[in-house]
Amino acid sequence: MDHLKRQDEKVFAAIEAELGRQRSKIELIASENFVSEAVMEAQGSVLTNKYAEGYPGKRYYGGCEHVDVVEDIARDRVKEIFGAEHVNVQPHSGAQANMAVYFTILEHGDTVLGMNLSHGGHLTHGSPVNFSGVQYNFVEYGVDAETHRINYDDVLAKAKEHKPKLIVAGASAYPRVIDFKRFREIADEVGAYLMVDMAHIAGLVAAGLHPNPVPHAHFVTTTTHKTLRGPRGGMILCEEKFAKQIDKSIFPGIQGGPLMHVIAAKAVAFGEALQDDFKTYAQNIIHNAQRLAEGLQKEGLTLVSGGTDNHLILIDVRNLNITGKVAEHVLDEVGITVNKNTIPFETASPFVTSGVRIGTAAVTSRGFGLEEMDEIASIIAHTLKNHEDETALEEARKRVAVLTSKFPMYTDL
């Protein structure tokens, strides 16, 4: 980054500091990952200069012959990975992908059935502070009070009662396998569309390690980062009969020019996901998450649903007499990055919370394995149990430093 360093020392310094943070801390935020240098090179390419409103072969600008190739590569690779009939890779984010689906099939005030945010849903699944909850009449389903797993009988009962036009499946903090086939059966029974938001599990689906929602859903949305390990962005997969409507909802509906440099980075990441070693990577994500969950439970920590089937773990910290906010802060102080998170049947404010959400996608990309998961579980428990003991916290910092020093990253940057 010699040019940047010469041109803007302040921005360069901030980027260098962030690189140092990523190298020196253990990244356990479930929605984050470390992309390859190839993905970063594509995103930092000259494609950032090109306007390309429209779609390949139907642009509103000239000079799009090369970016057309890039977008076609991205779309074709997604179709190959997930078996989708139609793909739109232009959404700037998962939220905009969800918005486009809503705009395609819903009218203002239509009823939608979505997962309660504190039970594991997402802001765009009907939260009253989000456009989805403002524009549409969302009815919430959740998890069982004892098992913390989705109660499909309750979903069916609410679907029959409220007759939603759309049912939204998928979550941002649900550590168990979701039965998409059952969701489609429920949707068909009440005459609703089914949209699956697979943002968190897309990489696991790509590797064949989580049921694929594409055969069951009318629409599938996802981010392209998280377990898929691409750049930050979104995309939509749908049945061919909805292709024109979806494309119009993205452009000119809610977006203008696509970010062609990001789409190039998406294409590179999709190519990586088609390689044999990506399945090994995804398997390691799950193995690491399950080993970490076991270690946390051995240390006496309480996990929502009692464990995990995917990359994600939700810790209930109430029995430690601390809040999620305090847990996030003290773990960050020792070099472990997590996020505070609501838990099912939450009583605390979303700015405070009773839980912490962690995930293993990023540490797995870094090369951490089962032994490292045992050590991380021990450090987390040690830190949370001794969160006011500076001597204990200093010991935790040293243990984190030992771990991160064994797994250098981005050494060419």
Swiss-Prot record:
Q: Name one GO biological process term.
A: glycine biosynthetic process from serine
Q: Where is this site: Plays an important role in substrate specificity?
A: 225
Q: In which pathway does it act?
A: One-carbon metabolism; tetrahydrofolate interconversion; Amino-acid biosynthesis; glycine biosynthesis; glycine from L-serine: step 1/1
Q: Does the keyword Cytoplasm apply?
A: yes
- Cite the Gene3D superfamilies for this sequence: Aspartate Aminotransferase, domain 1, Type I PLP-dependent aspartate aminotransferase-like (Major domain)
> What InterPro entries does its record include?
PyrdxlP-dep_Trfase, PyrdxlP-dep_Trfase_major, PyrdxlP-dep_Trfase_small, Ser_HO-MeTrfase, Ser_HO-MeTrfase-like, Ser_HO-MeTrfase_PLP_BS, SHMT-like_dom
Q: Which residues bind (6S)-5,6,7,8-tetrahydrofolate?
A: 117, 121-123, 239, 349-351
- Entry-linked Pfam families: SHMT (PF00464)
Quick check: keyword Disulfide bond in the entry?
no
Tell me the compartments it is located in. Answer: Cytoplasm
Question: What EC class is this?
Answer: transferase
| Key words, A-Z | Amino-acid biosynthesis, Cytoplasm, One-carbon metabolism, Pyridoxal phosphate, Transferase
Enzyme Commission numbers on file: 2.1.2.1
Complexes and interactors: Homodimer.
Q: Which PANTHER family match?
A: SERINE HYDROXYMETHYLTRANSFERASE (PTHR11680), SERINE HYDROXYMETHYLTRANSFERASE 1 (PTHR11680:SF35)
In which family does this protein belong, per the annotation? Belongs to the SHMT family.
Q: What is this protein called?
A: Serine hydroxymethyltransferase
Which gene does this sequence derive from? glyA
